[in-house]
Amino acid sequence: MTATKEESQKLLTSLRSQRDNKVCFDCGAKNPTWSSTTFGIYLCLDCSAAHRNMGVHISFVRSTVLDSWTYAQLRVMRVGGNENARNYFKRHGGVSLLNSKDCRLKYSSKTAKQYLEKLKSLAVEDEANYPDILDMDFLSNTHEGSSAADTTNEDDDFFSAWDKASVKKSDDNLDDKTDLASTSSSVVVESGEKDEPVVVTEEKTMVSPPSRPDSTSTTKSKTSSISSARARPIRASSRPTASKLGASRPQKLGIKKANADIDFDEFEKAVLSSESAPTKKPAAVASKESTVDTLVDNGVEEVKESTSTTVQGKPVKPVLKSAASAKSTKSDDSNLNANFARLGFGQFAAASNARAKAAAKARELKKNEVNAPTYARDHFASQKSISSDQYFGRGSFDPEAAAEAQERLSSFRDATAISSKSYFGEEEDENEEGESSHRPDSAYLRDIAETATEDIEAIKVAIHQGAEKLSDFIQKVGARYNF
């Protein structure tokens, strides 16, 4: 039985307003206006054409806007839908079929046939439970079920799951930082040279932005690190315990979060001071280095200083230099320059060298152009074309013959016409000229008469042919118009 237009439009509009029904089941295009009444799914125009090509025995396509619907078809659309079809395929081993582009394989499979049987049973139950096809309780229950599924199943929405995971992770980090802020640990490290203990205090990690460390503690740490031997401070674990104080946590592979108390200003000052230190040398250090250099040149193996020289209030360790160390320093400098060049430093010098090479090559090309031979321009400048034999003076080319021909042609510069005998310098036969000039008039007239006779015969033939064509044309016209 066919439903009215108002009933079908009201029901289909409500069904198409659901989230999963707003996209095509096959390709995901938005706002589908076609549907497969066999499977209760919504399709776009292109996918509906593919379903129509499969045949009505597999999928029967109807328009949700223009076509008329039966109550049985509307029941299938009520209990079906894109979400129900997709979930059924996933639960019954049809995930690969959902991703397949072969519609005939997808909708002729065993899973699709089982889904058709399921739709038929659901349609019968729906008709028994809701006799009125426009019963809104069915739609409200459907909306409530879909909303509950959205709230419980977090894996369906990838982006919401990602946001929730990140929020949870940030909360855990805040808890860790709060626990760490409540406790602080200090570790005593003894220096290698002196018995004075150096206290390395671990700063508190707070949730608020990190504060810059005090200048006094920084100065103290620098002085202790310079005066003492190389001693590595022991960092306490992020969660110190009473039983294992100062024990290091097992290292883990992966990405580690940087500490929040990094002071980049201190790093910059240290780099600038290290760069400016070689440029500003005290007189004592300069004299000491000059003395060491002279001793190295004389072949002294080692130079030891008994007293340490104080530079800018900092103790300087004894300097030990030898000839081998000087050579190694020079080799290290050369290797360093090569490494810097390989990394890209010094590109301007390479560019200048390339420009110098290009300029030298251009000068060489210009010099070659100046020294190029001018034989072709001197000998063949006025000619339009030349041959290879003529250019190289070989084969059948004879320069003397060519010069003679040029002279012969120059003698006929003002002549309007020339003969072959006059060109090659042969004497003309006077008898032939006399006979041609003294021919009798009768022979001349005879030639004219013969020529005229032939022309007259040709004219007669042409006139006869024209008359025949004209008569044929007149007969055809008379036969066509009956006159």
Swiss-Prot record:
GO terms for biological process: COPI coating of Golgi vesicle; endoplasmic reticulum to Golgi vesicle-mediated transport; intracellular protein transport; retrograde vesicle-mediated transport, Golgi to endoplasmic reticulum. The keyword Nucleotide-binding does not apply. Residues 169-250, 420-445 are annotated as: Disordered. One of its GO terms (cellular component) is Golgi apparatus. Residues 9-128 form the Arf-GAP domain. Keywords: Golgi apparatus, GTPase activation, Metal-binding, Zinc, Zinc-finger. Residues 213-243 have a biased composition (Low complexity). One of its GO terms (molecular function) is zinc ion binding. InterPro entries: ARFGAP/RecO, ArfGAP_dom, ArfGAP_dom_sf. The keyword Zinc-finger applies. Its main location: Golgi. A zinc finger (C4-type) spans 24-47. It is found in: Golgi apparatus. GTPase-activating protein for the ADP ribosylation factor (ARF) family. Involved in retrograde vesicular transport from the Golgi to the endoplasmic reticulum. This is ADP-ribosylation factor GTPase-activating protein glo3.
